[in-house]
Amino acid sequence: NLKVLEDSADIIGAKYKGQPTGNFADISITSFYGMHVINCAGNGGMITTSNIEYANKAKLLRSWGRSSSLFNDAEAIENRFNVKIDDIDYDAKFIFEKIGYNLEPSELGSAFGIVQFNKLDKILDHRKKVYHELSNFFLKYEKWIDLPKKNNHADTAWFAFPFFIKENAPFKRRDLMIFFENHNIQTRVVFTGNILRQPGYKNIKCIGAADDFVNADRVMRGGILLA
């Protein structure tokens, strides 16, 4: 009965063994944040599932937990004024079945996203072109950096260009990032790195300590993304 949630936030359009990412789980999420493969005027996201029960629950939670979010015609009189709460006549538009959120997409963002989606193939081709150009450029510096190696089964969307600074490099990551930024090349570290070292997670109870996750530490100390 294990349920799988797939984080496909950064990689819409990517495939593994010919199957689209997001197709390997009960529920998958995709992000439309500003620097991701496509965006909805700077923000937004999507949950996808083939399970109608999960889809309805997601719609419910998205819209304050209101049951009217599941109606095809929420304004119809026969839907609205034929319900009671504790013997009180009520409006079905304002019955809250769950404690939910206000995460409904805007029409502007949706319109922006549709245009972006229609250009997805062109966007993916451009990102792959940039990946090959950057790979060829940085090959001359392999003595000091580790370049990304693509899995043979993967067709990658290249949300960004990642690499690691080796410990023997004659420069620090901080200095390289400042150099790039001063030349209008946007950089970022690899998100949280070892999340157990982040201030907000210091007191989280988990299996193992921060020092146990050596690969996460390597990412945190030496990882760079070129956006």
Please report, for each region that a protein language model flagged, where it lies by residue.
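PLP-dependent aminotransferase class I/II
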Residues: 1, 15, 52-227
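Short acidic, glycine/proline-rich loop/turn micro-motifs
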Residues: 41-42, 158
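Conserved active-site segment immediately N-terminal to the catalytic lysine
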Residues: 5-41, 56, 94-95
